[in-house]
Amino acid sequence: MTVRDWDLRHFRLLDALAEAGSIGAAARLLGLAQPNASRLLDSMERSAGFALAERSARGSRLTDRGLVVAGLASEVLAAATRVTHAVDALAGQGGSLHICSSLTVAEHLMPAWLATARQRLPALSITLDVGNSASVFERLREGSVDLGFVEGPTIETGFHYLDLLRDDLLVVVPAAHPWAARETVGADEVASATLVVREAGSGTRQVAERALAAHTAESAAPSRLEVGSNAALVASVAAGLGPGVVSRMAVSPELLTGRLVAVTVPGLVLARTLRAVWPSRVPLSRETGEFLALVRSLIDG
């Protein structure tokens, strides 16, 4: 292989290595196994005839020559994106946008956003996949989606974020539960209870566990009932399987009918920020920018 055989995979690796600072972190950004990324870098160095990165026990970093090549690689990637947009425009297409959204956003906000997008951006083709916050980051890293929406506290490197709105989580119980008749419930009581929670990787679960950790004894290992969706969580709480922690948006119908009751827990902070997220290594596409502008206009009223 010669340098003339390099393709976008090679340029993406250099761009990610410049951003992440190590071959392992660059591999994670690209959704590659580290050995595969290392082999790709080795083949690039052989074809270039000089070292692109310095290896050490602390990781890998680009050499001075590597930084020059990485800067040019970034320009190539930006040009490739512009070519894609130009071809779409010349073909008279409105473009496409592939979104992966966490459950709360997908179930309670995305339908209105998509309906408005159909009216205001009729030529834009949108595909929506749904998962938890961890899977959103995974899909973005592997490059299979353009834009994500997450609801957890985790801020991962290699991404741009746009804060959208605040979402409050509530501790809820059935109307017949003893806590429903109390003015307040202690945070330590909630932390030690058998709670119905979302699965690991869910933003709802992350926020709940972080908030409850400060009120949980070090030796304690409270039991949890894990469910894979907001609807399953609400139904499990209503069936008496235990108190639950869930977004206000997901449980508002049950609160209005009195089927479930929100419990006041002084000192337990369960607020979170819903965010849009996209890879920092990829220029923001016209389609992504248009959809984000639409979302902001709907939120800001």
What kind of feature is each model-predicted range?
Residues 94-157, 218, 227-229:
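Central regulatory/effector-binding core of bacterial HTH transcription factors
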Residues 43-64:
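A short LG(V/I)-centered, amphipathic sequence patch enriched
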Residues 179, 194-216, 284-293:
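Secondary-structure junction motif
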Residues 15-33, 59:
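Short helix-boundary/capping micro-motifs
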Residues 47-48, 69-91:
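Alpha-helical linker/hinge and terminal dimerization helices associated
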Residues 109, 261-301:
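A late-sequence structural motif
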Residues 159-196, 200, 286:
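Flexible hinge/capping segments at coil-to-helix
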Residues 132-137, 141-145, 150-151, 201, ...:
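Hydrophobic hinge/microswitch elements
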